[in-house]
Amino acid sequence: MTSAGGFPAGAGGYQTPGGHSASPAHEAPPGGAEGLAAEVHTLERAIFEVKRIIVGQDQLVERMLVGLLSKGHVLLEGVPGVAKTLAVETFARVVGGTFSRIQFTPDLVPTDIIGTRIYRQGREEFDTELGPVVANFLLADEINRAPAKVQSALLEVMQERHVSIGGRTFPMPSPFLVMATQNPIEHEGVYPLPEAQRDRFLFKINVGYPSPEEEREIIYRMGVTPPQAKQILSTGDLLRLQEIAANNFVHHALVDYVVRVVFATRKPEQLGMNDVKSWVAFGASPRASLGIIAAARSLALVRGRDYVIPQDVIEVIPDVLRHRLVLTYDALADEISPEIVINRVLQTVALPQVNAVPQQGHSVPPVMQAAAAASGR
């Protein structure tokens, strides 16, 4: 017996990676098919506006939006000069809200990012001055250059979504999203994120080089007067879209598939993957399962659906698991990457063939319904 949302009966709600409760029940967006089509059109406008500035990197732009809709944080890794920082700044400008940037350096201390109490001699009292972490969108540039105590302070804010200064608690504004960047090729003067802290990020996205055609377009587009991004969304729009994404339908068979994939990273020998057992020291936590479901729901909304299909789950699994797997020294010596492990698991765990559409929902994607209705007028 399953619930209306395709989850096993009695499963109840769960918490998204952002720590907010979400119900598994499926609720259609206000306005039905036309309402969903309008929301998807708004998301498409936002993506188009970002792509006016960022040439190529289509998956990066889409995953950043999915992370925002999922209330999860994003870790970007790539060599210098591939538009990691520009992508985050442009994205924050397009989706609205307050934006703050912290350039991490070895001499930072936690109060530099969180804030502190300042004594006002004229009034003979203390004032609380909040740090740059209090913003809707925070860019943590080169997060692996800051010492561990600064990283821990930031990642605690990411998880708890509030800061405590002088015995007072200050909540983070909503929505709250941290996008951190790091450079994988520098090993001197850096402080790699520990496994427990990497687990706080919903996605880890590897940002690669552009193609020759894309690089040529970058030169033409940025050569004279670089284009300026315009705001498309507001914070109210974001909160509404997050709620819509959280209510997207997920078939119980897909939930079971996600659980089996994540479990296979912990006990691969039970599925006959003895090679994976020698590669992985520690598998993914239940937070990864929650992240995959939340991200698949958001990706479905970006793609114009109010239900999740197997392809949505397959696409987000590598980005959710990539930074959560702890490989053995033997695997690192043999140049076994997390991608190799993830592909091996996906090839072994059978993907269910299910009817992903809710029985009491739409039989075809709502955007298609709206388009058909418009053409029939």
UniProtKB/Swiss-Prot annotation:
One Pfam family named in its UniProt record: AAA_lid_2
Keywords (A to Z) from UniProt: ATP-binding, Chaperone, Nucleotide-binding, Virulence
Gene3D superfamilies registered for this protein in UniProt: Magnesium chelatase subunit I, C-Terminal domain (1.10.8.80), P-loop containing nucleotide triphosphate hydrolases (3.40.50.300)
Chain residues that bind ATP: 78-85
CC per GO annotation: peptidoglycan-based cell wall; plasma membrane
Bias (Gly residues): 7-16
UniProt feature, compositional bias: Low complexity: 19-33
Span list, region Disordered: 1-33
Stored InterPro entries: ATPase_AAA-3 (IPR011703), CbbQ/NirQ/NorQ/GpvN (IPR050764), ChlI/MoxR_AAA_lid (IPR041628), P-loop_NTPase (IPR027417)
GO molecular function: ATP binding; ATP hydrolysis activity
Family statement: Belongs to the MoxR family.
Function: Displays ATP-enhanced chaperone activity. Required for the proper folding of the peptidoglycan endopeptidase RipA and its secretion through the TAT secretion system. In vitro, prevents thermal aggregation of MalZ protein and protects the functional activity of the restriction enzyme NdeI from thermal inactivation.
Domain notes: Contains an ATPase chaperone domain along with a nucleoside triphosphate hydrolase domain.
Self-association state and partner proteins as the record states: Interacts with RipA. Interacts with host Toll-like receptor 4 (TLR4).
UniProt-recorded name of the protein: Chaperone MoxR1
Gene: moxR1
